[in-house]
């Protein structure tokens, strides 16, 4: 590199062997963390290439991920005292009448662990809030689910008013038949500022036939396998936005404060995305960055767009023609300028 005076620069630029002149700039190495012995799902979303013997249990990430962001787990409840949550999980609300403030099923605890637990979570510093809408048998009424969504929205709005933790995500790993009322509630929640991930469903059918998978403002998540194929049960179609690991996923569970379990389903894929939303929200560019979004932060619509654009394209097998072939990616703990520049 040469230091050039302004008039010389123009002369040099005209020379036939000069393609372009660029101002010299400092480049910083980004410190990133590698979690060894991580679940394969975390490893997969932090590598562009298919997993190998050297990478299958390594999660590459920014250790600040999740800080200051709240994630609402709208599910069977959460084992909030589990040691993996390190005191970051709290009980929000129990919607089904007469039900206890605990996860008697395990499903919600497993999802919460993928979002923000210490060993199994995408965003390891996230604040987790349990919103119980399903009973211990794993089922519940559509009206209770809608009430749970409304509770999350109100809680988010309350924290925005207080000026703290003003970024919130939500995960809903549940589904049923097509319900315009539920889709409406989820779409309204996203408009109110909640960054929302929902499961595509496990019927190996068009996700547009089910709710909340057909809620267009949310991010609808299909399930992929360790060998980069669509999981045999995963719903598909144009209502699916992205895929994430969903077969044999290790996470937190119930029964003790150290319990774990392997579960499969688009229910396990969706919290990878809720975790990623939480992760990215906490790592938004600072005010001195050229990518600074503004004091209000990134909107759910824009973050959804960036997340999909930044995903790894065309690596999954058995994806029907009308379904986006995109696998979630976290940036491997490196510089995220490409993510914010989308």
Swiss-Prot record:
This protein's GO CC annotations: extracellular space
A GO MF term: serine-type endopeptidase activity
Record bears the keyword Glycoprotein: yes
Active site per the UniProt annotation: 75, 107, 267
Ranges where the Inhibitor I9 domain occurs: 1-30
Claim: Acyltransferase is one of the keywords in the record: no
Classification via InterPro entries: PCSK9_ProteinaseK-like, Peptidase_S8/S53_dom, Peptidase_S8/S53_dom_sf, Peptidase_S8_Asp-AS, Peptidase_S8_His-AS, Peptidase_S8_Ser-AS, Peptidase_S8_subtilisin-like, Peptidase_S8_subtilisin-rel
Signal sequence residues: none
EC code: 3.4.21.-
Prodomain residues: 1-30
UniProt enzyme class: hydrolase
Function: Serine protease.
Designated name of the protein: Subtilisin-like serine protease Rho m 2.0101
Source organism of this protein record: Rhodotorula mucilaginosa (Yeast)
